[in-house]
Amino acid sequence: MGTMNHRPSRTPNPLRPASGPAHPDADRARTTARALAAALGVSGVLHLVRPAVYDSIVPRVLPGPARAYTVVSGVAEIGIAAALLSRPTRRLGGTLAAALFVAVFPANVSMAGRSVRSGRASSVRTAIAIARLPLQWPLVSRALLVRRAS
């Protein structure tokens, strides 16, 4: 009998996409990933350099100090931005970005509610706070596109 050529089986790497034809939305997903990474990176840095702005929108019902939520969310945004920029971790980055956008939605609702109830907030600030609410869902959708096509 001839010798059999056996290759050791490779365990698939969950961070590396399987080879094969590119997803039809791969180019759009890559561009979207870069845009999301830029937005998340800037927002994450702002959380760390101007935390008081974000402390004020942490829902009061959450236990513990608002600053802890501000710092953790800022670090998470920077980490997710990095994951979105790296091809091997882009799929994970899309998943985490979608989860983050859903997780921060209560803070956006809280900010809009406080802005409406407060007579001190400018009408422009109130309009921005309210306009952000429906815009959160396209962000989730774009992050899921990155996940799906990466």
Residue ranges and their predicted role:
Residues 1-150:
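Short amphipathic, positively biased membrane-proximal segments
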